[in-house]
C-alpha cells in the first residue's frame, strides 16, 4: 500500500481566524485562553482534513502562533540573550515580544524563507550561545492529535538548516562551530518525541537545495549518525530544488526515508531510483494554486510503485503553508469565472488530489476513473482555452525588434537632454511614491468597492487627496513631485486589476509572517493592458503644479514575484508579457506630458534562484523584461527605478544593466554602507540613496541626514546624487511625514549652498 502524508498545513485558518484572534489578543481584547482554544480548534480541523483524505499520518508541530523557526529557537534554547527571557518558562506574551519587539528590544530580524514569499525570524547566534532542549511545543501537539485518535508524524526543521538560516552576532566566529553543541540538544528533543510513541519523525533539511559549503555538507553524515540512534524512524525532507548532486551523500545517510520535491525538480528522480529505503515523492505543487493533471502524475508514480512498492510515499512538494486554504469558499470566482475556477486547487483540493492518487496506486486507475476523467477534462480545457491564449500577445513578443529593450542613446547623452528641460537644482529632492493612506482614503476605497459610493464621488475623494498631497509637496519645496497613490490599495493588486490575464480571489490568503497575510493575484492568461491605468491620475496631479510630476508604476518582475503565476509557459515569458503591457502605459504617460516615470522593482533580488549557477539566466530575462517596460521612450524621458534591499554587491552588473536613468535605494539603516559597492563598481547613472528610515515614525535630526548625505557625496559625484526617503510613505502618519521631509529639504538646501560656493 502507498502511504500518503502532508509536509505541513497552513496555520491561519480558512478565513484568517488566527490572524484576527492574534491581533485582538495584542490589543488586549481577547483573553489568552480564548486564543489558545481557537488555535486548538484550527489544529483539530487541519488534522481532520488530513485524516478524512485518507492520510496515513497527520502532521503535527507545523502549527505555530508566529513562525516555525521562532518555535525552534525556543525549543533549542536559542532565543536572543538580549531579551533576558528564559526559553524554558517563556510566556505567550514573551514569545510575541521576540517576534514584535518591546520597549527595550527591537524585534528579531525577518527574512524570506528560501525563495518563497513567507518570512521567518532569523536566529541570532553568538560565540557563547548555549542550547537547552524544550520540546514542549512538539510534545503537546503530538498528545493533542493522539487524544483525537490520529496516527501522528511530527515535523521539525533539521539542525544544519536551522544553523544555516541564522546569523552570527557579536564577537566574530563561525556559527558552524555551534553544531557540536546543537546536535545533542536535537537528540534530546527527538528522544522526547519518540517517547510519545510516534513511529516516524519528519526532519526538514531544505538547505540541501542550496549551494552549501563543503564542510556543511560533510557534516550531514556525522549529524544524522547521531540522530539515527533515536527510537523512531526518520524521514529527511528536502524541497524547493534539486538535491541530485548530493545523491551519494543522501543514499548513505542513516535515515529511514527521503522526501524529494518532484515539482520544482522532476529531473532529480533519476538519481534516486535505486534508493533502498522509503521514497516520499512530492508530486503535488505546494507553492502554486493549479490543479494537477493526475493522469500525468500517475505516469510518473506507477513505475515508482512497481520499484518501491510499500516504500513509496506520496506528498505535496513542500509544506502547503504557501497555498490558500480552501477553493470552495470562492463562490464569487466560481460565479464570475467558472472556467478559471475549474483549473484551481487550494490546500484542501490538493489533499483531495493526493487521495485520488493514493487510491489509483493501490486499486488501479479504474477505481478513480471519474476523478481522473474530471482532472483530464480540466487540463485539456486549460490547454486549449482562448481565455488564456491570445495569438496577438505571442505575435507581439515574437516580433519585437532586435534592440527593443535598448534606449536610443547611452546615459551620458540622455542625461544632458533630460537635465536641459528638467532644470533641477543640485541634489534634487523627491519622494519614492506613496504618501500616508489615511483612514478616510481606505474607507472611500472600501465603500466604492462595495457599491456604497458612486464613481463620481470616489473620484472626487481621490482628486481631493491628490491635490492635498501636491500642495503639501509644494509647501515643502520638493523638486520632483508624486501624486501620492491614494487610489492604490496595493502596488501589485492595483495593476493586476487593470491588466487582462489576471484574476483575484476573495479568500486566497497566504501567510507572509506572523499575523500578516497576503492575497496574491492569479496570473492565468496572456497579459495585455486594455486601457490606460494611471495616466489620468498623474495628468490631473501635473495640472495642479508647474513642478515636475513623476509617474509611478510597479515593474514586471515584482508583479510576477508577488503573484500566483501560470505554470503552462515559462515564468520568463510571463514576465516579458507584463513588461510589454507596461510599455504601453509608459508611452501613454510620456504622451500625456509625464516625462519622469518610476518603475519600481523591489522584488528583483528575491527572484534569484537558490543556486548560483542559475542566476545569470534569471538576471538576463528579468533585466530584459524591465527594459521592455520602457521600450520606445524618448531620450529626454527620465526613467527611475526603486529597490529596497540590503545586498547589492553580487548583482550590481545586472542592476546597472537595467539602464534606469535614476535608481533610488534603501540605505539609511545601513549608514550608507551600500553605496561603497556602487562606488567600487563605478555605477554609471544617477543615484538617490535613502536618507532616512520610513519604517519608523521617528523624525531624524538634521545632523543625521547631513551625516548620511556627506557620506554619499564622498562616493557619488554631486551632479549624480538625488535626495529622498528610503521608501514610500504609505504606512506613516501625516504629522511625522511633514516633519521628516522638512528636515530632509532643509539639510539639502544647506549642502546645496555649500557646494555652490
UniProtKB/Swiss-Prot annotation:
Name assigned to this protein: 5-methyltetrahydropteroyltriglutamate--homocysteine methyltransferase
Stored Pfam families: Meth_synt_1, Meth_synt_2
Origin species: Actinobacillus pleuropneumoniae serotype 7 (strain AP76)
Cofactor note: Binds 1 zinc ion per subunit.
EC main group: transferase
Function of the protein: Catalyzes the transfer of a methyl group from 5-methyltetrahydrofolate to homocysteine resulting in methionine formation.
Record-linked Gene3D superfamilies: 3.20.20.210
GO molecular-function terms, A-Z: 5-methyltetrahydropteroyltriglutamate-homocysteine S-methyltransferase activity; zinc ion binding
Amino acid at each position: 500500500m502507498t502511504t500518503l502524508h502532508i509536509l505541513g498545513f497552513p496555520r491561519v485558518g480558512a478565513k484568517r481566524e488566527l490572524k484576527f484572534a492574534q491581533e485582538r489578543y495584542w490589543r488586549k481584547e481577547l483573553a489568552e485562553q480564548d486564543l489558545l482554544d481557537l488555535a486548538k480548534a484550527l489544529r483539530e480541523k487541519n488534522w481532520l482534513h488530513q485524516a478524512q483524505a485518507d492520510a496515513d499520518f497527520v502532521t503535527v508541530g507545523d502549527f505555530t502562533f508566529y513562525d516555525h523557526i521562532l518555535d525552534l529557537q525556543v525549543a533549542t534554547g536559542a532565543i536572543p540573550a538580549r531579551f533576558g527571557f528564559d526559553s524554558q518558562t517563556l510566556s505567550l506574551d514573551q514569545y510575541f515580544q521576540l517576534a514584535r519587539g518591546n520597549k527595550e528590544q527591537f524585534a528579531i530580524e525577518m527574512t524570506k524563507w528560501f525563495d518563497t514569499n513567507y518570512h521567518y525570524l532569523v536566529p541570532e547566534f553568538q560565540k557563547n550561545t548555549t542550547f537547552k532542549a524544550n520540546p514542549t511545543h512538539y510534545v503537546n501537539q503530538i498528545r493533542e492529535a493522539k487524544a483525537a485518535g490520529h496516527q501522528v508524524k511530527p515535523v521539525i526543521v533539521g539542525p544544519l538548516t536551522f544553523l544555516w538560516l541564522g546569523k552570527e552576532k557579536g564577537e566574530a566566529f563561525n556559527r558552524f562551530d555551534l553544531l557540536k553543541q546543537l546536535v545533542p540538544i536535537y537528540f534530546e528533543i527527538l528522544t522526547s518525541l519518540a517517547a510519545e510513541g510516534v513511529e516516524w519523525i519528519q526532519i526538514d533539511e531544505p538547505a540541501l537545495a542550496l549551494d552549501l559549503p563543503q564542510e556543511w555538507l560533510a557534516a550531514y553524515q556525522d549529524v544524522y549518525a547521531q540522530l539515527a540512534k533515536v527510537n523512531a524512524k526518520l524521514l529527511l525532507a528536502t524541497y524547493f530544488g534539486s538535491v541530485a548532486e548530493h545523491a551519494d551523500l543522501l543514499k548513505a545517510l542513516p535515515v529511514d526515508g527521503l522526501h524529494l520535491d518532484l515539482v520544482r525538480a522532476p529531473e532529480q528522480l533519476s538519481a534516486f531510483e535505486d534508493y533502498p529505503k522509503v521514497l516520499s515523492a512530492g508530486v503535488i505543487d505546494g507553492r502554486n494554486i493549479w490543479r494537477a493533471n493526475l493522469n500525468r502524475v500517475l505516469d510518473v508514480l506507477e513505475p515508482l510503485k512497481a520499484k518501491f512498492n510499500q516504500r513509496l510515499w506520496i506528498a505535496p512538494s513542500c509544506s502547503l503553508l504557501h497555498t490558500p486554504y480552501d477553493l470552495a469558499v470562492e463562490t464569487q470566482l466560481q460565479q464570475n469565472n467558472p472556467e478559471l475556477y475549474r483549473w484551481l486547487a487550494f490546500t484542501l483540493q490538493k489533499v483531495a488530489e493526493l487521495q485520488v492518487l493514493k487510491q489509483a496506486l493501490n486499486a488501479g486507475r479504474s477505481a478513480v476513473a471519474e476523478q481522473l476523467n474530471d482532472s483530464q477534462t480540466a487540463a485539456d480545457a486549460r490547454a486549449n482555452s482562448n481565455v488564456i491564449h491570445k495569438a496577438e500577445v505571442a505575435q507581439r513578443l515574437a516580433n519585437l525588434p532586435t534592440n527593443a529593450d535598448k534606449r536610443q542613446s547611452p546615459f551620458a547623452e540622455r542625461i544632458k537632454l533630460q537635465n536641459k528641460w528638467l532644470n533641477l537644482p543640485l541634489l534634487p529632492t523627491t519622494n519614492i511614491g506613496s504618501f500616508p493612506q489615511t483612514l478616510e482614503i481606505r474607507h472611500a476605497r472600501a465603500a466604492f468597492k462595495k457599491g456604497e459610493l458612486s464613481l463620481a464621488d470616489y473620484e472626487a475623494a481621490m482628486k481631493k487627496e491628490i491635490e492635498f498631497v501636491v500642495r503639501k509637496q509644494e509647501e515643502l519645496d520638493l523638486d520632483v513631485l508624486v501624486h501620492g497613490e491614494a487610489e492604490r490599495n496595493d502596488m501589485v493588486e492595483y495593476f493586476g486589476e487593470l491588466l487582462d490575464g489576471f484574476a483575484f480571489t476573495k479568500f486566497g490568503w497566504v501567510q507572509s509572517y506572523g499575523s500578516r497575510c497576503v492575497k496574491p493575484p492569479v496570473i492565468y492568461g496572456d497579459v495585455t493592458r486594455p486601457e490606460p491605468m494611471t495616466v489620468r491620475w498623474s495628468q490631473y496631479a501635473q495640472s495642479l503644479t508647474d513642478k515636475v510630476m513623476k509617474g509611478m508604476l510597479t515593474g514586471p518582475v515584482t508583479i510576477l514575484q508577488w503573484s500566483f503565476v501560470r505554470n503552462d509557459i515559462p515564468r520568463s515569458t510571463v514576465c516579458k508579457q507584463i513588461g510589454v503591457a507596461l510599455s504601453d502605459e509608459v508611452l501613454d504617460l510620456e504622451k500625456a506630458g509625464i516625462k519622469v516615470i518610476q518603475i519600481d522593482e523591489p522584488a528583483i533580488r528575491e527572484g534569484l534562484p537558490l543556486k548560483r549557477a542559475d542566476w545569470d539566466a534569471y538576471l538576463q530575462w528579468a533585466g530584459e523584461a524591465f527594459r521592455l517596460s520602457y521600450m520606445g521612450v524618448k531620450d529626454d524621458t527620465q526613467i527611475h527605478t526603486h529597490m529596497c534591499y540590503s545586498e547589492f554587491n553580487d548583482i550590481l552588473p545586472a542592476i546597472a544593466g537595467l539602464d534606469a536613468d535614476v535608481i533610488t535605494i534603501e540605505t539609511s539603516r545601513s549608514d550608507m554602507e551600500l553605496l561603497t559597492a556602487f562606488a567600487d563598481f563605478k555605477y554609471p547613472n544617477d543615484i538617490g540613496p535613502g536618507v532616512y528610515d520610513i519604517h519608523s515614525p521617528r523624525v531624524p535630526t538634521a545632523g543625521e541626514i547631513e551625516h548620511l548625505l556627506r557620506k554619499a557625496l564622498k562616493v557619488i559625484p554631486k551632479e549624480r546624487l538625488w535626495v529622498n526617503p528610503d521608501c514610500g510613505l504609505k504606512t506613516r502618519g501625516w504629522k511625522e511625514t511633514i516633519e521628516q521631509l522638512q528636515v530632509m529639504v532643509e539639510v539639502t538646501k544647506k549642502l546645496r549652498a555649500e557646494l555652490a560656493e
